[in-house]
């Protein structure tokens, strides 16, 4: 009789667990997009990221740990840190294993700084293999560094697109040059079929159904001079003005930090912000607890921010997506 009671007790506990899990699954958020940062931008909500220019520990364990990170997206630096695609792939696998996020997304968004300078179209095309290998790991976006020339930006957009996507081809773009054979590994990270991945792996908002965010670093005097033309290229979602490198390029090294900036730096920021607004491109700038509300009011929609700053920003804009 005692054994029967134990069996019934175990069965009852198991049923309760199943019911609890079913209720939790039913109540879990149901994201509209794979890319959390993109979904927030679509909602008109600012996006906050974390990451170091010294690089991210590219390992499965670190990815699993970062799956529940406070930030909306992770900036994975390969511009100044080693270009190690295998480590990035392991990190993405860890993120998927540690998910879903509190917002219901399979992973946080990951955007990679790839070590390709947008000097000209030929340079970008010669190094497009880097974009292809990075995208095959399942990341959600790429930043083109030192995006100096509109031809380079155009080549960048074409390099990351599959040729099946035709939006913008009638507006100066050529068809995409990305090959299909990296789709299978990326699809596993996104949790979709290869066909679904190919349909979704495109530049948003150029393609309203796309899930990739393409950004520009307009971070030197050459990019500054061409900012308006660079941002007219279809397919770019966001841009930053890179105050650290910009200050070096403009001859005022160290002026990109906190505090009052020289007039030449203020003018550079204002020009790039205005060009972003004119071309409906989201503007990226760093934020801290003291200035985050003013930055948002000024039009900043993405940026690195501490957990304290993100709490202030999210409450100020009345974000509804769980975090």
What is each stretch, according to the model?
Residues 1-7:
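N-terminal secretory signal peptides that target proteins for export/translocation
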Residues 25-323:
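Expand to "…catalyze enediolate/carbanion chemistry for C-C bond making/breaking, isomerization
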Residues 10-22:
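Bacterial N-terminal signal peptides
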């Amino acid at each position: 009789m005692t054994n029967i009671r134990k069996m019934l007790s175990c069965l009852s506990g198991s049923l309760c667990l199943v019911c609890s899990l079913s209720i939790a699954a039913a109540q879990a958020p149901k994201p509209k997009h794979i890319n959390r940062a993109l979904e927030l931008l679509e909602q008109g909500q600012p996006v906050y990221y974390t990451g170091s220019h010294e690089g991210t520990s590219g390992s499965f364990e670190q990815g699993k740990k970062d799956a529940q990170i406070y930030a909306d997206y992770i900036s994975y630096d390969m511009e100044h840190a080693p270009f190690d695609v295998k480590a990035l792939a392991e990190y993405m696998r860890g993120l998927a294993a540690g998910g879903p996020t509190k917002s219901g997304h399979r992973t946080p968004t990951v955007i990679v700084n790839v070590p390709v300078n947008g000097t000209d179209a030929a340079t970008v095309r010669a190094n497009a293999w880097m974009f292809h290998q990075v995208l095959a790991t399942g990341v959600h976006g790429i930043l083109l560094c030192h995006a100096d020339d509109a031809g380079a930006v155009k080549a960048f957009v074409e390099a990351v697109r599959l040729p099946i996507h035709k939006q913008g081809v009638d507006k100066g773009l050529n068809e995409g040059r990305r090959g299909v054979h990296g789709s299978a590994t990326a699809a596993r990270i996104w949790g979709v079929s290869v066909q679904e991945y190919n349909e979704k792996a495109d530049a948003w908002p150029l393609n309203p159904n796309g899930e990739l965010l393409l950004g520009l670093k307009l971070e030197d005097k050459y990019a500054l001079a061409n900012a308006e033309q660079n941002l007219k290229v279809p397919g770019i979602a966001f841009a930053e003005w890179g105050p650290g490198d910009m200050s070096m390029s403009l001859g005022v090294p160290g002026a990109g930090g906190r505090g009052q900036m020289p007039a030449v730096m203020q003018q550079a920021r204002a020009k790039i912000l205005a060009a972003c607004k004119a071309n409906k491109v989201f503007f990226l700038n760093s934020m801290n607890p003291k200035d985050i509300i003013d930055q948002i009011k000024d039009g900043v929609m993405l940026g690195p921010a501490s957990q304290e700053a993100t709490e202030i920003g999210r409450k100020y804009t009345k974000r509804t997506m769980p975090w």
